[in-house]
Each structure stands twice: as C-alpha cells, then as structure tokens.
C-alpha cells in the first residue's frame, strides 16, 4: 500500500501527540538534572576557589610576618655590626692635617724588579756591607733573606714564627728584629757565628703590657735600640690590618721606646703618635725621625729625649701635609731621608675626621671592605726623598703599580721598594 503525503503527515502528527509529551518531559528532566549537576560543580569550584584564596591569604600573611621579622632581625644585626659591636680601638675626633702644595721635585728614573718568589709579603729592607736584606713570609713563618743588590746569591739567614715587621744592624753586626706573633709584639737580638744563628728575646712587655705591634727598629752605635709600637690596640690580623685600624680610629696611642741592652731597661722616648709606622736614626744630627701615619707627618725628636709627646716640647713636626700616609723611613749615606707612603690621602676619612660614628662604622666593616677605603694607585706618589737639613724635596717616586708601600731601602744609586701583595722588589734610579 502506498502512503501519500497526507497519510505521512497524519502518522507524524499522531506520533507526536502520543510520544511528544513523554519525550518533552524526559528532556526537561534531563535538562534540570544537568543544570543541578552544573550548579553543584560550580558550588564545589567556588568552595575550592574560596579555600585556595584563604590558603593564599594565610600564606601571604605568614610571609609578610616572616618578612617583617627578617627585616627587623637584619636591622638589629646591622645596627649591632656597624654601631654597637665592641671594637678594640674606639675612634676619637681629630683635626685633619693640611694638604701640602706641590714640591716640584723631579721624578726618579725608571729601574727594574727583582723576583723573590716563592717568598711573599715583603715587610722590611736593609743594606749592610754591600748585601741587601729583606724580611718576607715563607709559608706561615717569617724569613730573613740576604742577596746581592742584583738579586743573585740569595740565601735564608733565619726563619721565625709570626711576621718580621722590621730589623736593623748594629755596628757590631748584631741584628735587632721586631716581630708580630700570636702572643703580641716582640723585640729580638740576633747573633751569628761559625756555630750558626742565635735568636734572643729581649722585650715582649712594657710595664706589664704586651707590645701590640712594633713596626720599626733602629740601632745606634752606643748600643741603644729604638723601636716603635704602632698603637695600644692589639694587632690580631697582621700589620696591614693594624695600620688601617689606627688610621681610621686615630687613637694617638703610638709610641717610640729605647732599649738599653747593658741595663736591660726600656724607656719611653715619644708618645701620642697616631700610628708609629716608621723610624729612621740620624746619628750625626742626633735625631730620630718618626712616621705619624694618621697625622700625615714626620716628627723629629732628639735621641737623648725621654717622655716627650708628639707635637709638644722637644718634638717638632719636621715634615707635614704629606700627600699620603707615611710608613717606612730610611736614610742614605748622604743623609737624605726617604719617606714611603702606605696609602694616598683619603678624602672620605679626613672629611669625617670629627665624626666618630661613621669612622666607628668603618672600623666594624670586614677586612675586605676596609681595604676599599684606602688605596695607592699607579698615579699616586709612592715615596719621596728630602734633605732634612734644608727641607728641600729631592726626588719623587711615582706609584707604578697599585698596592701599599711596605718597605724601602736606598742602596747606592738605587732605591728598592716593596709593595703589598707582590713577590718582587721594585727599584728606581736616583
């Protein structure tokens, strides 16, 4: 039987009237169920999101609290480290010295170098009977070397514990040597004969107080031995660190003493020095020249003087307003005085000469950071030569390389210089 269009439409109408309501009801129920499921999922997501937001807020609050605690602890540590932490040398206010005008002295002619490796930290130089002597470090020990001025024939004279800070020859060949050891400073007498070298401790304390840091020594023909003590504060990290400490603190507690080997007594020659860093003895003029590190000057005092104060009666400022902080001193055969400079003048330090708080903070910095406060560049003056009688400047020795000047020694037409951190000696022609 054929179904026409009318019949087909009637069948579809009857089917829709019969099945349609049930299908519509089923679709409606399915849609409602889907909507409920979606709403429940949305509510669960909302709850989870709220929980996550609450957790984030709690973590953030904890982090903020920890950050505040950390900042407070860091601030307390910083205040303690830079302001409240005890230091051995409390800074004192002082008046910064003037700056000297240009002298017009000629530059020394270029020379050369002598390599001393494996020896390091050359701290003192002397000439005796045509030989050049040098104090250096060999491992952890101090070592005294002897060589020809051209570096040949190098031998070890002796080794000792600690750091040899300076040495001097007496007319009878005795070597007087100052050292810095773990127990403090020492003054030794060194004798040598066919049996070898003997080292005798002569001074380790003065009036019951241990030597802090003897930095220079000079021996007179009458047997008297003059030596310096850098400052009252103990040097725990070597001479270089002790010099920076006194330069920053400017305690003015450095001294010069004289030891009488016959009587075994020690007398005070000069006090009130802001870093007694160098010493030279002119026996013809009966004068001691003393480097004052912090005051940028050289004092002159009679060898017979006792209990004098720097700048007081019987102690005049022989050279002042120097371009750097003076260290080792030396006299040549003609009486010319050579002055070495540890560092160039620090504008920051002297601008804050009267401000103990900032200088106290600088004293509490690490050793590496303190080293950045002072420098001597290749363009600065490393050493100078002056005629003490007339005060006329003879020669200027330029920096050449960076690093503080630790020692110098005139030998004939040459001047030898040692620079911190190097294993070689520099020399120039004068």
Predicted feature residues:
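Internal/C-terminal transmembrane anchor helices
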Residues: 60-83
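Hydrophobic single transmembrane helices highlighted by the model
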Residues: 1-22
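Short, Lys/Arg-rich N-terminal segment immediately upstream of the first membrane anchor
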Residues: 1, 53-62, 133
């Amino acid at each position: 039987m054929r179904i026409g269009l009318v019949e087909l439409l009637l069948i579809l109408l009857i089917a829709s009237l019969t099945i349609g309501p049930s299908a519509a009801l089923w679709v409606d129920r399915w849609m409602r169920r889907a909507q409920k499921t979606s709403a429940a999922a949305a509510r669960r997501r909302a709850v989870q999101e709220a929980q996550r937001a609450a957790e984030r807020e709690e973590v953030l609050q904890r982090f903020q609290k920890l950050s505040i605690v950390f900042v407070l602890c860091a601030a307390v540590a910083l205040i303690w480290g830079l302001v409240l932490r005890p230091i051995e040398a409390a800074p004192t206010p002082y008046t910064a010295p003037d700056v000297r005008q240009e002298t017009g002295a000629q530059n020394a002619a270029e020379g050369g170098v002598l390599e001393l490796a494996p020896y390091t930290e050359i701290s003192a130089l002397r000439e005796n009977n045509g030989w050049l002597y040098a104090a250096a470090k060999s491992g952890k020990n101090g070592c005294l070397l002897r060589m020809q001025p051209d570096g040949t024939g190098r031998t070890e004279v002796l080794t000792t514990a600690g750091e040899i800070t300076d040495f001097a020859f007496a007319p009878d060949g005795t070597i007087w040597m100052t050292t810095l050891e773990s127990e403090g400073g020492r003054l030794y007498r060194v004798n040598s004969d066919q049996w070898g070298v003997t080292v005798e401790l002569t001074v380790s304390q003065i009036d019951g107080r241990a030597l802090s840091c003897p930095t220079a020594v000079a021996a007179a023909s009458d047997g008297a031995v003059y030596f310096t003590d850098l400052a009252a504060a103990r040097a725990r990290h070597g001479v270089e660190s002790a010099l920076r400490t006194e330069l920053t603190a400017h305690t003015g507690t450095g001294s010069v003493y004289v030891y009488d080997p016959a009587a075994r007594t020690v007398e005070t020659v000069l006090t009130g020095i802001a870093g007694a860093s160098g010493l030279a003895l002119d026996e013809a003029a009966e004068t001691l020249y003393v480097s004052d590190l912090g005051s940028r000057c050289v004092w002159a005092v009679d060898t017979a003087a006792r209990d004098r104060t720097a700048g007081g009666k019987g102690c005049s400022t022989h050279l002042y307003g120097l371009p750097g902080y003076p260290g080792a001193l030396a006299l040549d055969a003609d009486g010319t005085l050579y002055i070495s400079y540890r560092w160039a003048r620090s504008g920051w330090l002297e601008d804050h000469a009267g401000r103990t708080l900032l200088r106290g903070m600088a004293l509490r910095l690490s050793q590496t950071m303190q080293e950045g406060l002072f420098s001597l560049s290749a363009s600065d003056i490393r050493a100078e030569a002056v005629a003490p009688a007339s005060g006329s400047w003879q020669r200027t020795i330029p920096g050449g390389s960076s690093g503080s000047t630790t020692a110098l020694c005139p030998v004939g037409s040459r001047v030898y210089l040692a620079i911190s951190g190097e294993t070689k000696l520099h020399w120039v022609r004068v």
